[in-house]
Amino acid sequence: MSTVASTGMSLSQNYYLRSYYQNNQKMFKASTRKETSNSRLSYEDGLALRRAARNLQSFEYSKNDNGENICNSILAFIDTYNNTLKSGGASSSSDVNRYARHLKQLSHKYSDDLSSLGITVNTDGTMTANKNLLGKSSASDVGKVFGKEADFTKKTEQYARKMESKSSDSLYAALTGSGSNIDFQA
């Protein structure tokens, strides 16, 4: 996406959300989320968060990049991160819960770095952004937190991939009945 970002064309936060949730673009809408099982949400959110982290790693954080696109991409990342924390934390799978806790700890670990960009880490691990402060941050400062070599995005992608995998396993078990209690009395 770095090619698109440097073309001078401004892409909206919704564009990035649709891109992150490309398998099921309705999943970032509150009305759809209310009607969807938590297992499915955890899977879709993990997949979307992995895409979001990779997207942020793909930007060239230089003065030539379109800062508005980077800002909108980060805002969409934050929405996706928050969705993932909520669905993972509410999952019945202990594995999925574990990776949601890792994500929560990760955001707290990097809260000072995020705060310097105008991003507040709440007590539950979710994030909120001050768009004005984020937009005024230097590209190099943003790149230190979200760039290709940044530990925060690397770890986010790692935990999201593991959460997606465990959620997929849970969905498969629910669909096939594997892992269920089997009554051997006949």
Task: Label every PLM stretch briefly.
Residues 2-186:
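Polar, low-complexity export/assembly segments characteristic of proteins
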